[in-house]
Amino acid sequence: MAEKYDFQTIEKKWQERWKEADLFRTEETTAKPKFYGLDFFPYPSGAGLSVGHCRNYIPTDVACRYRHMNGCNVLHPTGWDAFGLPAENEAIKQGSHPKKTVPQIIATYKRQMNLIGIGYDWSREINSSEPDYYK
């Protein structure tokens, strides 16, 4: 047995496998039972995820994985509540415009969510500050 658990190598290996298998993408048509898991969409308004974000996302992820492992077709989407005061206030704090800061913050949050290993169907990602969201 190894003296030290190399979590970075092990987690990277499994996350790459999940990505290659497109494990968390919802099947469009299937006879499997359906399950829908939804978290609140985070405000892209800070330097990164907090423990509070994890406290909210991990239980939903556990429920979705459990259903997936038990044969359900799981829809677990995510997105960004990026149109409002939190995003605007963060942009003001940074001396910038939300059109510039929101994509940067979203990229950071998304990278961190992937590091945590949350199983979102990223093909269904939405952003409330995008014009297409309102069509």
Place the predicted regions along the sequence by residue:
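N-terminal, positively charged nucleic-acid-binding surface of large information/translation enzymes
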Residues: 1-135
